[in-house]
Protein backbone atom coordinates (compact mmCIF):
# COMPACT_ATOMS: atom_id res chain seq x y z
CA UNK A 1 0.00 0.00 0.00
CA UNK A 2 2.82 2.43 0.85
CA UNK A 3 4.44 1.80 -2.54
CA UNK A 4 1.19 2.66 -4.30
CA UNK A 5 0.84 5.88 -2.31
CA UNK A 6 4.43 6.92 -3.00
CA UNK A 7 4.14 6.06 -6.70
CA UNK A 8 1.20 8.45 -6.95
CA UNK A 9 2.51 11.19 -4.67
CA UNK A 10 6.19 11.47 -5.63
CA UNK A 11 5.68 12.09 -9.39
CA UNK A 12 3.06 14.70 -8.48
CA UNK A 13 5.44 16.29 -6.00
CA UNK A 14 8.46 16.55 -8.30
CA UNK A 15 6.86 16.99 -11.72
CA UNK A 16 6.55 20.73 -11.23
CA UNK A 17 7.02 21.79 -14.85
CA UNK A 18 3.89 20.05 -16.09
CA UNK A 19 1.86 21.15 -13.09
CA UNK A 20 3.08 24.75 -13.17
CA UNK A 21 4.59 24.36 -9.69
CA UNK A 22 5.47 27.70 -8.20
CA UNK A 23 6.83 27.62 -4.65
CA UNK A 24 9.13 25.17 -2.88
CA UNK A 25 8.56 25.25 0.89
CA UNK A 26 10.52 24.11 3.95
CA UNK A 27 8.76 24.26 7.31
CA UNK A 28 8.95 23.11 10.91
CA UNK A 29 7.05 23.60 14.13
CA UNK A 30 5.27 22.10 17.10
CA UNK A 31 2.47 19.58 17.32
CA UNK A 32 -0.12 19.55 20.11
CA UNK A 33 -1.21 15.93 20.02
CA UNK A 34 -3.45 13.60 22.05
CA UNK A 35 -5.40 10.35 21.89
CA UNK A 36 -9.19 10.10 21.96
CA UNK A 37 -9.26 7.47 24.74
CA UNK A 38 -7.98 7.25 28.30
CA UNK A 39 -5.38 6.95 29.67
CA UNK A 40 -3.46 8.76 26.88
CA UNK A 41 -5.96 11.56 26.29
CA UNK A 42 -3.85 14.36 27.85
CA UNK A 43 -2.29 16.61 25.17
CA UNK A 44 1.47 16.91 24.89
CA UNK A 45 3.85 18.79 22.60
CA UNK A 46 5.99 17.14 19.94
CA UNK A 47 7.54 18.40 16.71
CA UNK A 48 7.04 18.20 12.97
CA UNK A 49 8.85 19.17 9.77
CA UNK A 50 8.09 18.97 6.06
CA UNK A 51 9.10 19.77 2.50
CA UNK A 52 6.33 20.97 0.21
CA UNK A 53 5.27 22.43 -3.12
CA UNK A 54 2.56 24.94 -3.98
CA UNK A 55 1.50 24.53 -7.60
CA UNK A 56 -1.17 25.77 -10.01
CA UNK A 57 -0.74 28.94 -7.98
CA UNK A 58 -1.26 31.28 -10.88
CA UNK A 59 -2.94 30.42 -14.19
CA UNK A 60 -4.54 32.52 -16.90
CA UNK A 61 -7.96 31.09 -16.12
CA UNK A 62 -7.94 31.55 -12.34
CA UNK A 63 -6.27 33.48 -9.55
CA UNK A 64 -8.09 32.33 -6.44
CA UNK A 65 -7.05 28.73 -5.72
CA UNK A 66 -4.06 26.40 -5.90
CA UNK A 67 -2.88 22.95 -4.81
CA UNK A 68 -0.32 22.19 -2.13
CA UNK A 69 1.49 18.89 -1.41
CA UNK A 70 3.82 18.04 1.46
CA UNK A 71 5.96 15.17 2.62
CA UNK A 72 7.52 15.21 6.07
CA UNK A 73 7.80 13.87 9.59
CA UNK A 74 5.28 14.04 12.41
CA UNK A 75 5.48 12.66 15.94
CA UNK A 76 2.08 11.62 17.31
CA UNK A 77 1.65 11.13 21.03
CA UNK A 78 -0.63 11.17 24.05
CA UNK A 79 0.11 11.41 27.76
CA UNK A 80 -1.16 9.49 30.76
CA UNK A 81 -2.01 12.24 33.25
CA UNK A 82 -1.63 9.89 36.25
CA UNK A 83 1.65 8.10 35.49
CA UNK A 84 3.18 10.64 33.12
CA UNK A 85 3.93 7.96 30.54
CA UNK A 86 3.47 8.71 26.84
CA UNK A 87 2.34 6.75 23.82
CA UNK A 88 4.72 7.97 21.09
CA UNK A 89 4.61 7.19 17.37
CA UNK A 90 6.83 8.38 14.52
CA UNK A 91 5.17 8.85 11.13
CA UNK A 92 6.06 9.80 7.59
CA UNK A 93 3.33 12.30 6.72
CA UNK A 94 1.94 13.00 3.23
CA UNK A 95 -0.87 15.35 2.23
CA UNK A 96 -2.32 17.18 -0.75
CA UNK A 97 -4.64 20.14 -0.10
CA UNK A 98 -6.97 22.24 -2.22
CA UNK A 99 -6.55 25.86 -1.07
CA UNK A 100 -8.32 29.13 -1.75
CA UNK A 101 -6.40 32.38 -1.39
CA UNK A 102 -6.82 36.12 -1.10
CA UNK A 103 -3.92 38.50 -1.73
CA UNK A 104 -3.38 42.13 -0.80
CA UNK A 105 -0.16 44.13 -1.00
CA UNK A 106 2.59 41.64 -0.06
CA UNK A 107 0.40 39.32 2.05
CA UNK A 108 -1.57 36.25 1.08
CA UNK A 109 -4.17 34.48 3.24
CA UNK A 110 -5.14 30.90 2.46
CA UNK A 111 -7.45 28.16 3.69
CA UNK A 112 -7.62 24.59 2.50
CA UNK A 113 -8.48 20.99 3.15
CA UNK A 114 -7.48 17.63 1.75
CA UNK A 115 -6.58 14.00 2.47
CA UNK A 116 -3.55 12.88 4.46
CA UNK A 117 -1.73 9.58 4.89
CA UNK A 118 0.71 8.75 7.70
CA UNK A 119 3.09 5.79 7.56
CA UNK A 120 4.48 4.44 10.84
CA UNK A 121 8.26 4.35 10.43
CA UNK A 122 9.01 2.64 13.76
CA UNK A 123 6.47 -0.05 14.48
CA UNK A 124 5.80 -1.71 17.81
CA UNK A 125 3.00 -3.46 19.67
CA UNK A 126 -0.29 -3.61 17.78
CA UNK A 127 0.11 -0.28 16.03
CA UNK A 128 -1.24 0.32 12.53
CA UNK A 129 1.27 1.13 9.83
CA UNK A 130 -1.04 3.38 7.82
CA UNK A 131 -3.25 6.13 9.20
CA UNK A 132 -5.71 7.82 6.82
CA UNK A 133 -7.21 11.17 7.68
CA UNK A 134 -8.10 14.73 6.68
CA UNK A 135 -6.15 17.94 7.12
CA UNK A 136 -7.89 21.35 7.24
CA UNK A 137 -5.43 24.25 7.31
CA UNK A 138 -5.24 28.04 7.38
CA UNK A 139 -2.16 30.11 6.60
CA UNK A 140 -0.63 33.53 6.13
CA UNK A 141 2.28 34.29 3.77
CA UNK A 142 4.45 37.40 3.65
CA UNK A 143 6.46 38.00 0.47
CA UNK A 144 9.91 39.42 1.19
CA UNK A 145 10.72 39.61 -2.54
CA UNK A 146 9.55 38.25 -5.86
CA UNK A 147 11.07 34.88 -4.95
CA UNK A 148 11.31 34.58 -1.15
CA UNK A 149 8.37 34.33 1.24
CA UNK A 150 7.78 33.57 4.91
CA UNK A 151 4.64 31.81 6.05
CA UNK A 152 2.79 30.61 9.13
CA UNK A 153 0.20 27.83 9.16
CA UNK A 154 -2.18 26.20 11.61
CA UNK A 155 -3.41 22.72 10.68
CA UNK A 156 -5.56 20.08 12.33
CA UNK A 157 -5.04 16.37 11.63
CA UNK A 158 -8.10 14.18 12.10
CA UNK A 159 -7.40 10.46 11.82
CA UNK A 160 -10.06 8.21 10.33
CA UNK A 161 -8.17 5.04 11.26
CA UNK A 162 -6.69 4.03 14.59
CA UNK A 163 -3.01 4.42 15.39
CA UNK A 164 -2.73 1.82 18.17
CA UNK A 165 -4.65 -1.12 19.65
CA UNK A 166 -4.23 -2.37 23.22
CA UNK A 167 -5.54 -5.46 24.98
CA UNK A 168 -7.86 -4.69 27.91
CA UNK A 169 -8.43 -6.66 31.12
CA UNK A 170 -11.53 -8.27 29.62
CA UNK A 171 -9.46 -9.45 26.61
CA UNK A 172 -11.07 -6.89 24.31
CA UNK A 173 -9.04 -4.50 22.16
CA UNK A 174 -9.15 -0.74 22.63
CA UNK A 175 -8.33 1.29 19.52
CA UNK A 176 -6.73 4.70 19.94
CA UNK A 177 -7.34 7.50 17.45
CA UNK A 178 -4.98 10.45 17.39
CA UNK A 179 -5.70 14.15 17.02
CA UNK A 180 -2.99 16.69 16.21
CA UNK A 181 -2.94 20.49 16.06
CA UNK A 182 0.12 21.77 14.19
CA UNK A 183 1.68 25.25 14.35
CA UNK A 184 4.42 25.69 11.75
CA UNK A 185 6.57 28.43 10.27
CA UNK A 186 8.50 28.15 7.05
CA UNK A 187 10.26 29.74 4.13
CA UNK A 188 9.22 29.52 0.50
CA UNK A 189 11.21 29.92 -2.71
CA UNK A 190 9.53 30.60 -6.06
CA UNK A 191 11.16 28.33 -8.64
CA UNK A 192 9.38 29.56 -11.79
CA UNK A 193 10.93 32.43 -13.74
CA UNK A 194 7.53 33.72 -14.80
CA UNK A 195 6.40 36.51 -12.52
CA UNK A 196 3.40 35.63 -10.35
CA UNK A 197 0.84 38.36 -9.79
CA UNK A 198 0.59 38.06 -6.00
CA UNK A 199 -0.95 41.50 -5.78
CA UNK A 200 -3.78 40.86 -8.24
CA UNK A 201 -6.52 41.72 -5.75
CA UNK A 202 -4.78 44.81 -4.42
CA UNK A 203 -5.47 46.61 -7.70
CA UNK A 204 -9.20 45.82 -7.72
Predicted regions span which residues?
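Outer-envelope beta-barrel architecture signal
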Residues: 20-24, 61-67, 105-111, 146-150, ...
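Internal catalytic-core helix/loop-beta-alpha segment
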Residues: 110-125
